[in-house]
Each structure stands twice: as C-alpha cells, then as structure tokens.
Amino acid sequence: MSLSQPLFIKLLLKHWKIHNIPVSAGYLTYSTTLAIVPLVMVVFSIFTAFPIFQEATEQLKTLIYDNFAPNAGDMVEEYIDLFVANSKKMGIVSTIGLVVVALMLIQSIDETLNKMWRNHRKRSIFISFLLYAVILFIAPLLAGGSIAISSYIFSMAIFNENGLLSFSQQLLQYTPFLLIWLLFTTVYWLVPNTKVNILHAMLGAIVAAIFFTLGKQAFVWYISTFPSYQAIYGALAVLPIMLLWIHLSWQVVLFGGLITSTLNVYNEMKKGKLNL
C-alpha cells in the first residue's frame, strides 16, 4: 500500500482537528475514571470463576497496572484492590449498577470511534448490548487465556534446554506489545458500525501500539527524572499521574483509530469517490 504522504498527512491533520482528539480523549478519561473500578471488578470476577486462570490473573494484573499507571502501578493496584474488595460486599442491585457503569464506558468508546467514520447509523439496542457484553466478558477471557497458554508453552521442558530458556524469556517480553496490538486491531475492526478493512485496522493498531509502548517509556522516564509532582501533591500524587497517563493513552488509541478511518477516506479519494 503506497501512500502519497503529503495528501495522507494533510487528511490526517484535517481529521485530527475536525474530531478534536484531545477533547475526545478528555471525555473518555472522565468516563474511564468513573468506570475503572467497576470494570476491574467485572474483569477479575470473571477470572475467579475460572480456576484455570488463577496463575494468569496475577500476570494480567501486572500487565494492566504497569500499562494503566506506569511508575505508580503498585499504589493504584493497592487502591483498586481495596475498592474491588469492598464491592464484593454489595448486593445484587449495586453489582448490576457497577456492570452498567462499565458498559457505559464501552458505549462511550463506541460512539467516539464511530464519529471518526462519520457513521450516523445506530445499532439496535440488542446488538449494542450484545457487542458491549462480548467486549466486557469475552475480551478478559481471551487475554487471560493467551497469557496462560503462552506461560504454559514457555514453561515446557523444550524451552529449558539447549539455550532456549533465554529465547522463551525474550519472546515473553513481547507478549504485552502483541496483546496491545491485537486489542487495538480488534477495536478498530469491530467497533465501528461499518465495514473496516482489516489491513487498515492492523496498520492503525501497530502505529498506536508503538506510540503507546514508547509513550509509556517516555512517561516513566519523565516521572522518574522530574518528580516535582510528588512535592506538590504528596500522597495524592498518584491521582494526577493516573489521569495524565489515561488521557495520553486515549489520545494514542484515538490516533490509531483516526489513521484507520483516514486510510479508508484516502483510498476512496484515490478511486475518485471523494473530494478533499
């Protein structure tokens, strides 16, 4: 796929301004802040229902907290574990309320991404609920299953012989990146209520995954090198760190979606079906 870079970049910048990505990321940051505890509660409740994922659960926790709040993962994990423990004491009505809040976050993501495709068609309530439920309940199982399978495979005797141990460890280092790429690809491909070219989704996802990974490293470096926020916020320093990282993460996610949708517009323009 050859791209006329000036035209493609011009389209990308135009759509960035039209969709006001920083503002959209701020909206999703607010939604995430409200939904993070219900979302984590639902995810790990699913894991506890499947004993086979017991070992994978701890690895997935580490993966989530390291990417969710780099350089503050331990403190965030402590608070969220406390909130989740308290949520287990709630009744059925309150639990249903938490699930609804988690589904509302997924709905916010759905609406934001569909705006990028200028898609005004609405899914039926049943289809929307089914899609959100699949994302909420099936995605954690797929993530846990992939981690459990990879851990099992690389713990086999063959990887402990002939110097393959270091090879398996190197492969496992790329597991988080591959999972993020797969997650982004799935979101860009399935969430928009229109036909999306899988190659476009994969390309947008790989760019987003690279920016996400590099951004996390840069964020950790900045926080470690310039810790002035700790002197200002003290014990509450984890809050602005978490909010800032969530906002940056959503900008990366939306940027990947923007690339995916812009590729579609670019191809339509090449075919003469659209004008700039």
Swiss-Prot record:
Span of the signal peptide: none
Subcellular location(s) per record: Cell inner membrane
Which segments cross the bilayer?
33-53, 90-110, 125-145, 147-167, 171-191, 203-223, 239-259
Q: Identify the Pfam families for this entry.
A: Virul_fac_BrkB
**Swiss-Prot/TrEMBL keywords:** Cell inner membrane, Cell membrane, Membrane, Transmembrane, Transmembrane helix
Main subcellular location: membrane
Keyword Ribonucleoprotein (UniProt): no
Q: Does the keyword Isomerase apply?
A: no
Q: Which domain of life is it from?
A: Bacteria
Q: What's the protein's topology in the membrane?
A: Multi-pass membrane protein
Report the GO terms under cellular component: plasma membrane
InterPro entries recorded: UPF0761_bac, Virul_fac_BrkB
User: Which family, according to the similarity comment?
Assistant: Belongs to the UPF0761 family.
HAMAP family listed in its UniProt record? UPF0761
**Xref: NCBIfam families:** PRK01637.1 (NF002457), yihY_not_rbn (TIGR00765)
Name it: UPF0761 membrane protein APL_1950
Organism from which the protein derives: Actinobacillus pleuropneumoniae serotype 5b (strain L20)
